[in-house]
Amino acid sequence: MTNTQPGSALPDEIAKFNRLAAEWWDPAGPMAPLHAMNPLRTGWVDSHVPERGRLLDVGCGAGLAAEAFARMGFDVLGIDAAADPIAAATAHAEDAGLSLAYRVATAEALVAEGMRFPVVTALEVIEHVTDPAQFLALLSRLLEPGGSLFISTLNRTLRSLAVGKIGAEYIARLLPAGTHEWRRFITPAELDRAARPAGLRLVATRGMSYDLRERTWRGSADLSVNYLAMLRLA
């Protein structure tokens, strides 16, 4: 799929993640950092959503977060513009006996269908889209009034360049080289400014720090590299 509408994933990003689909569920493979990060990401969402209901996971990839949300009791729909990860996600969920739905689709497609959800997540996605402000506007149109949007991404700081880009991809080799473009990282202040015209308000943030020796993630007050954000639709 090569959708180039504003806010959509870039075609080269879609191709990149299609290539990774077969190895997505390997905890020792190229997606190992996401496997390690997943409990922190999904647990933070869980702690902010007391009610169990419908949840849309935008840019779900092969379903790491979507499956975790389904196990928590959410009624999950995962969408991704890349077909191969969706195929891997569907097969993995079937093997695990989990009841959740996946579609090869963009946020634009669901907006056109008039779909709305009380909870929308876009984890490690916004740094891969053409226009973050337009992407946030699309996500706001997928939320029910008062709904919550959860973003997980990387801050654009010198530390994130050193740690999240150069260190992770070229020194520690935690991620395949070229996974991220540092110039596409977004600061929390930029996220807040981009979200406000869409009626979204930033209500909570949490930093995520990686322990290289333990190969584990922990929550922290440090937002300088990886961080989580919760936004609410007025």
For each feature predicted by the language model, list its residue ranges.
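N-terminal, positively charged/glycine-rich alpha-helical extensions of SAM-dependent methyltransferases
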Residues: 1-25
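Short glycine/proline- and charge-enriched loop/turn segments
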Residues: 25, 168-177
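Conserved S-adenosyl-L-methionine
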Residues: 201-211
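Acceptor-substrate binding/catalytic loop of class I
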Residues: 173-190
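Core SAM-dependent methyltransferase catalytic element
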Residues: 216-234
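Conserved class I S-adenosyl-L-methionine
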Residues: 150-172
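Conserved SAM-binding loop
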Residues: 42-49, 53-158, 188, 229-231
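Conserved SAM-binding loop and adjacent beta-strand
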Residues: 26-45
